[in-house]
């Protein structure tokens, strides 16, 4: 066992003395058992994590009963919703790297034999997953589970995005102070990751398809007693994985990655999933390129539409309708789309995991013969405005905006854009451009939920597009094109735009362009001043110096895979 490094031999007497002092070691027999890290992300700032302390307790008890010695440790987390719209959002994506590094540090410093990862929200799941693949010891993921959708007294279903959009509606006097307060008080009824197909739930669903979590991980509610049972099962499984030395790189292969992207496209997941899955692929040393995604999306039907694409369906409905397993089973009917032989932490193949699943409500999970669209709910756009690509959640774009040409309204930061939207500077037909908000320029590639929600709330969702080198919340909807690469801070073409430039977005053709010649773009860029970092001290200053493009997952410059092709 790896842990023998810190517990076997006369020379490890000091180590054993310290281990005994923790209270976790209760007898000399414990040194013969595998040391299992319970990597928890409990904190009281994130509603998706406020209940994880109890899940950690359950995991520890079950690991001990199964023959392991559990050591719980915590890592940080950021609530994207609370961090939204201020300096805090610049720390959100950057926290992913801190989480990965901190988990790696604890696991390697203490020579743990296996890990039970208990994440839930946006950057915590991918951060832990990056660390797990980096250290490559047996691991299993079991998330905290999704939040229930909220309901107003009149029976209307609401969620966090309802509140953000209500702010825009309130600014136009469409709703009263009291109506806004009613939505605010009912949208988030309890613990769990926010209730739609936002980033947290997207990543926790993808964990099943990647093979690193048990069936049900992505959809069983935080408040459902089955969630505790899932934690127990996962905690027993880690002992099996340690004994068989089944490691995450044995599971997360290229075929598992493609399975996960197929699920992502079928559910119209958050655009952030692309960012995170590319980063995870890098840690697994899989040579996967951004440009491959459109070919996969082209053969993956969009069969499960969930909030924010529709307020009629939330994650609890997906669970009731059969969950991720039912979606994967339906997709498996398409020849060659999924690799059902992919191994999983259950000890079974993906095909065996989903064999008993069924669609229980075709209004929630459609069949492949009756999809919302024949192609997936996410797409990568290319053109002279995004030579290295940009990402759009096609499943949340209204039909009228799938093709759009309009004049640019350019803003060099998110705050100015929000002000412009609220002050009616933005008119129907415009293309809002928010730049210098990329991984380096932001820094931290902040989410644009506030401006997209303001656009929707002010009734402009069917007539205004927004493009940015930043990113979007999983809750954003509308013609929102993000991750524009190269970013403005790297002198990408988006930096050359001026007010009035005509921008054409053609989502079916997967293109995004500005009506300028290459020469004109280059001439404008040559006249730009050298980019001046916005933050010059602390973690974000270091992050900005090391972070790479969104098209490589915004990973740090420590890998041979981090340069765009």
UniProtKB/Swiss-Prot annotation:
What Pfam families does UniProt report for this protein, alphabetically? Answer: ILV_EDD_C, ILVD_EDD_N
Q: How is the cofactor bound?
A: Binds 1 [2Fe-2S] cluster per subunit. This cluster acts as a Lewis acid cofactor.
Record's keyword terms, sorted:
2Fe-2S, Amino-acid biosynthesis, Branched-chain amino acid biosynthesis, Iron, Iron-sulfur, Lyase, Magnesium, Metal-binding
Q: Which residues form the signal peptide?
A: none
Q: A GO biological process this protein is involved in?
A: L-valine biosynthetic process
State its Enzyme Commission number(s). Answer: 4.2.1.9
Q: Which positions bind Mg(2+)?
A: 80, 122-123, 447
Q: Which residues bind [2Fe-2S] cluster?
A: 121, 194
Q: Catalytic positions? A: 473 (proton acceptor)
- Tell me the residues on which N6-carboxylysine occurs: 123
Gene Ontology CC: cytosol
- GO molecular function list: 2 iron, 2 sulfur cluster binding; dihydroxy-acid dehydratase activity; magnesium ion binding
Disulfide bond entries: none
- UniProt keyword Lyase, yes or no: yes
Catalytically driven reaction(s) = (2R)-2,3-dihydroxy-3-methylbutanoate = 3-methyl-2-oxobutanoate + H2O; (2R,3R)-2,3-dihydroxy-3-methylpentanoate = (S)-3-methyl-2-oxopentanoate + H2O
Q: Which cofactor does it need?
A: [2Fe-2S] cluster; Mg(2+)
Write out the pathway annotation from the protein's UniProt entry: Amino-acid biosynthesis; L-isoleucine biosynthesis; L-isoleucine from 2-oxobutanoate: step 3/4; Amino-acid biosynthesis; L-valine biosynthesis; L-valine from pyruvate: step 3/4
Described by its record, this protein's role is as follows: Functions in the biosynthesis of branched-chain amino acids. Catalyzes the dehydration of (2R,3R)-2,3-dihydroxy-3-methylpentanoate (2,3-dihydroxy-3-methylvalerate) into 2-oxo-3-methylpentanoate (2-oxo-3-methylvalerate) and of (2R)-2,3-dihydroxy-3-methylbutanoate (2,3-dihydroxyisovalerate) into 2-oxo-3-methylbutanoate (2-oxoisovalerate), the penultimate precursor to L-isoleucine and L-valine, respectively.
Subunit structure of this entry? Homodimer.
Q: Which family does it belong to?
A: Belongs to the IlvD/Edd family.
Which NCBIfam families does the entry mention? ilvD, PRK00911.1
Name of this chain's protein: Dihydroxy-acid dehydratase
Gene name of the record = ilvD
């Amino acid at each position: 066992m790896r842990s023998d490094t810190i517990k076997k031999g006369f020379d490890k007497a000091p180590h054993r003395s310290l281990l005994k002092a923790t209270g976790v070691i209760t007898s000399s027999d414990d040194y013969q058992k595998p040391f299992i890290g319970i990597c928890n992300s409990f904190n009281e700032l994130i509603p998706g994590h406020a209940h994880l302390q109890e899940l950690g307790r359950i995991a520890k008890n079950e690991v001990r009963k199964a023959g392991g010695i559990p050591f719980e440790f915590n890592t940080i987390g950021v609530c994207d919703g609370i961090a939204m719209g201020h300096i805090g959002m610049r720390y959100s994506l950057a926290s992913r790297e801190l989480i990965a590094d901190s988990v790696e540090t604890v696991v390697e410093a203490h020579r743990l034999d296996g890990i039970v990862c208990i994440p839930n929200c946006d950057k915590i799941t991918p951060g832990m997953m990056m660390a797990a693949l980096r250290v490559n010891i047996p691991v299993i993921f079991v998330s905290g589970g999704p939040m229930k959708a909220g309901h107003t007294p009149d029976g209307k279903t609401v969620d966090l995005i309802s509140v953000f959009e209500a702010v825009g509606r309130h600014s136009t006097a469409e709703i009263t102070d009291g109506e806004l307060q009613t939505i605010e008080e009912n949208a988030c009824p309890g613990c769990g990751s926010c209730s739609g197909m936002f980033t947290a739930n997207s990543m926790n669903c993808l964990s099943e398809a990647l093979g690193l979590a048990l069936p049900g991980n992505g959809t069983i509610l935080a408040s459902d007693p089955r969630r505790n049972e899932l934690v127990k099962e996962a905690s027993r499984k880690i002992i099996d994985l340690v004994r068989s030395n089944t490691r995450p790189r044995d599971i997360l292969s290229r075929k598992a990655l493609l399975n996960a992207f197929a699920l992502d496209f079928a559910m119209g997941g958050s655009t952030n999933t692309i960012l995170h899955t590319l980063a995870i692929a890098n840690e697994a040393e899989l040579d996967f390129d951004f440009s491959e995604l459109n070919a996969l999306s082209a053969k993956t039907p969009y069969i499960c539409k969930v909030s924010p694409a529709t307020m009629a369906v939330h994650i609890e409905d997906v669970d009731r309708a059969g969950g991720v397993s039912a979606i994967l089973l339906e997709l498996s009917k398409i020849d060659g789309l999924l690799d059902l032989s992919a191994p999983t932490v259950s000890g079974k193949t993906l095909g065996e995991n989903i064999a008993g699943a069924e669609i229980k409500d075709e209004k929630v999970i459609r069949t492949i013969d009756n999809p919302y669209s024949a192609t997936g709910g996410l797409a990568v756009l290319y053109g002279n405005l995004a030579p290295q690509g940009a990402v759009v959640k096609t499943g949340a774009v209204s039909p009228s905006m799938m093709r759009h040409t309009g004049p640019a309204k350019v803003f060099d930061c998110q705050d100015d854009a929000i002000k412009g939207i609220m002050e009616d500077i933005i008119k129907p037909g415009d293309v809002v451009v928010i730049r210098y908000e990329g991984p380096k320029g932001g820094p931290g590639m902040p989410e644009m939920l506030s401006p997209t929600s303001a656009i929707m709330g002010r009734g402009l969702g069917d007539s205004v597009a927004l493009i940015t080198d930043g990113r979007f919340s999983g809750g954003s909807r509308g013609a929102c094109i993000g991750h524009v690469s190269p970013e403005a801070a790297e002198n990408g073409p988006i930096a050359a735009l001026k007010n009035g430039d005509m921008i054409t977005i053609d989502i079916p053709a997967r293109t995004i362009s500005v009506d300028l010649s290459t020469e004109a773009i280059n001439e404008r860029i040559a006249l730009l001043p050298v980019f001046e970092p916005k933050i010059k001290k602390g973690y974000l200053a270091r992050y900005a110096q090391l972070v790479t493009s969104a098209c490589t997952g915004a990973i740090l410059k420590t890998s041979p895979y981090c340069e765009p092709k």
